[in-house]
């Protein structure tokens, strides 16, 4: 991979760099925050080839492959380059050929263009896969212009879905998420719009992302929620405290975004790393000069397990997530074929109960320092919807 980003090198001590998480403006960073994910780097001598993904998982009543593929960066990388469209189609189709049937998109990705790329790629086998999209950010329905704030009025949700269906070249969306909770709109009203769309056959299941706990309960009481999509990885274990237990209580599946810790868990970041201008990780305190040396202990732990299990660090990080609950389905994203194949190989990494207990204990002993997102992005997480009057 090319380490250059618009002439500004991002150096990493001899380690092949993973895709940069770029965002040219604050609004773009916020809008994209629901799907920050990186491709896997082959950093040990494990093969990047993969057989078909073994096993299926249930998100509520929705059956999917044990891993998914996030397609967020397939229209425009964070280095601002435009990936080869035919190559993106090839990656998606190869993933399907290897048994991956769960593809994650959103209207905010692109905006709009990622949905078009996914729709083009899956057209030959649309009814054999599960596709997701998301609404909620203030995206112009026609131009895709990204504006500040959120919008989840029922009429707007329905209009957004019509656009999604056209771009995805389909007559239904298997799983539709509210990308972030709009604090001005009762979640009961949002659920009502989804009910109408389900009655029309345009949406089959629904979910929420980064919502408040009370909102999740209210939403599920109004219309059963299939899945929650939140950030979750070895680097950010916050959902373990309340969100995952609530999902277990309610029978809701869990889909971790950024399952590789914005690339950190692959070994792509070390003490010598210098982020390019605009890379959101450059303003994340987890990777500041003060906190990074402490947090690198986590990477060393993952690398040690990679050697022990004869896998790549990416596979260890993903397999660890899948070992936490049988209804957790990570969605690592990539624009590189080899990285996609490496990622799906995580399905073949198994931990014994003793191993997972040992690894969890070691992880707990490492206290990650710093906040997971910049404050202006984090402000959209854990939000409660307005009460229904």
Q: What would you call each of these model-derived segments?
A:
Residues 82-95, 153-166, 216:
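Short, acidic/polar
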Residues 105-120:
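Glycine-rich, proline-tolerant flexible connector loops at the mouths of alpha/beta enzymes
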Residues 73-85, 145-155:
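Active-site mouth loops of central-metabolism enzymes
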Residues 182-361, 366, 380-386:
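Beta/alpha (TIM)-barrel catalytic core signal, keyed to glycine-rich beta->alpha loops juxtaposed to Asp/Glu
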Residues 64-68, 102, 128-132, 172-175, ...:
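Structural preference for beta-strand elements that scaffold enzyme active sites
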Residues 1-15:
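N-terminal secretory signal peptides
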Residues 14-19, 29-47:
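N-terminal twin-arginine translocation
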Residues 36-68, 81:
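C-terminal segment of N-terminal export signals and the immediately downstream linker at the start
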């Amino acid at each position: 991979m090319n380490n250059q980003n618009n002439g500004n090198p991002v150096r990493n001590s001899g380690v092949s760099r993973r895709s940069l998480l770029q965002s040219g403006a604050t609004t773009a960073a916020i809008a994209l925050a629901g799907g920050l994910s990186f491709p896997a780097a082959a950093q040990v001598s494990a093969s990047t080839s993969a057989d078909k993904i073994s096993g299926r998982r249930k998100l509520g009543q929705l059956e999917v492959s044990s891993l998914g593929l996030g397609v967020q960066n397939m229209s425009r990388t964070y280095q601002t380059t435009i990936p080869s469209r035919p190559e993106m189609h090839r990656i998606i189709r190869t993933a399907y050929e290897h048994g991956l049937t769960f593809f994650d998109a959103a209207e905010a990705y692109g905006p709009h263009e990622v949905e078009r790329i996914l729709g083009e790629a899956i057209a030959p086998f649309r009814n054999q896969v599960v596709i997701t999209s998301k609404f909620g950010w203030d995206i112009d329905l026609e131009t895709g212009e990204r504006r500040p704030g959120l919008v989840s009025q029922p009429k707007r949700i329905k209009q957004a879905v019509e656009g999604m269906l056209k771009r995805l070249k389909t007559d239904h969306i298997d799983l539709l998420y509210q990308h972030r909770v709009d604090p001005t709109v009762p979640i009961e009203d949002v659920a009502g719009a989804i009910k109408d769309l389900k009655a029309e056959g345009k949406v089959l299941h629904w979910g929420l992302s980064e919502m408040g706990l009370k909102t999740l309960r209210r939403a599920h009481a109004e219309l059963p929620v299939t899945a929650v999509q939140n950030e979750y990885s070895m680097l950010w274990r916050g959902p373990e405290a309340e969100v995952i237990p609530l999902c277990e209580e309610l029978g809701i599946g869990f889909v971790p975004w950024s399952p590789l810790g914005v690339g950190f868990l692959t070994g792509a970041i070390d003490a010598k790393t210098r982020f390019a201008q605009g890379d959101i990780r450059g303003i994340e305190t987890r990777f500041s000069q003060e906190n990074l040396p402490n947090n690198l202990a986590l990477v060393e732990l993952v690398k040690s397990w990679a050697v022990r299990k004869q896998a790549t660090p990416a596979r260890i990080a993903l397999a660890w997530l899948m070992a936490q609950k049988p209804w957790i389905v990570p969605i690592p994203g990539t624009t590189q074929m080899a990285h996609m194949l490496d990622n799906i190989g995580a399905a073949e990494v198994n931990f014994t109960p003793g191993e997972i207990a040992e690894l969890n204990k070691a992880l707990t002993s490492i206290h990650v320092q710093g906040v997971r997102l910049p404050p202006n992005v984090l402000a959209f997480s854990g939000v409660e919807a307005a009460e229904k009057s």
